[in-house]
A protein has these predicted regions:
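Periplasmic-binding protein-like
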Residues: 9-11, 85-89, 168-207, 225-226
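Extended ligand-binding regions for polar small-molecule ligands
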Residues: 28-38, 94-104, 110-113, 121, ...
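Acidic, polar ligand-binding/catalytic clefts
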Residues: 32, 43-110, 120-121, 164, ...
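Short helices/loops that flank or line small-molecule/ion binding pockets
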Residues: 37, 46, 50-62, 78, ...
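Sec/Tat-exported extracytoplasmic proteins
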Residues: 38-39, 59-60, 65-68, 83, ...
């Protein structure tokens, strides 16, 4: 009988982060609630993404979360049902009139506008292939939002939930999203091959907390919507 699951993830508030010596966050809490309902406790540790993948490779972790599914990863791991869908949007200063058309080449729509992006992060080919003339890299989402307010760039590409969380926490005003461009990614928990029973129990628990309302309660706890 499975009683404990060792999971890893990289720190990414408000989805998983450490506060007052405890790991909390939307994704962490959803996973914890899904497994708790099955009588399984979760032991989560946070590391850089590369360290997380290394721990999975050494089988020192049972699963990794907030991961996208690729053919290569699907060969290595057993993927859960969808944990949630993440969305990244272009943010701008309030009053700056700009909107996008998803059917038109992104670079041509940007013109002379600079875009703030996370260093080392892969978005979509349309964004990743933008030249240095368009992009300014920052090390954190907080730096992206502050850079936007300080006019380092006209647009910042930030996860919707992260932006909402940081703007409330840091009391940042004068920022809103630009319509017409959204990057959506489905996120999962990936379990070690051989732990299909754990994945199955998680999936059942996830369905149950979505049905009984706990899933939505977790999002609201952090000021977010599903």
């Amino acid at each position: 009988m499975i009683s404990k699951a060792r999971l890893v993830a990289d720190p990414y508030p408000p989805y998983q982060f450490e506060e007052n010596g405890r790991i909390i966050g939307v994704d962490h809490d959803v996973i914890t609630e899904s497994l708790k309902i099955q009588g399984i406790t979760v032991e989560t540790s946070l590391h850089s993404w590369d360290e997380c993948m290394a721990l999975m490779g050494k089988r020192k972790a049972d699963g990794i979360f907030q991961i996208t599914r690729t053919p290569e990863r699907a060969r290595r791991f057993y993927f859960s049902e969808r944990l949630r869908t993440a969305s990244a949007l272009f943010y701008k200063k309030t009053g700056f009139a700009v909107k996008f058309n998803s059917t038109v080449d992104l670079a041509s729509q940007l013109g002379n506008l600079k875009v703030g992006v996370l260093s080392g992060y892969s978005y979509t080919p349309a964004v990743d292939n933008l030249g240095n003339a368009y992009k300014i890299e920052k090390e954190s989402s907080e730096s992206l939002l502050n850079g936007l307010l300080q006019d380092e760039f006209a647009l910042a590409l930030v996860d919707r939930g992260v932006a909402s969380y940081l703007m409330a926490k840091l009391r940042l005003e004068g920022i809103d999203s630009a319509p017409g461009h959204e990057i959506s990614r489905e996120l999962y928990v990936a379990f070690q091959k051989g732990l299909s029973e754990l994945a199955h129990l998680f999936n059942i628990g996830l369905r149950r907390i979505k049905k009984n309302g706990v899933y939505g309660e977790v999002f609201r706890r952090y000021g977010l919507s599903e």
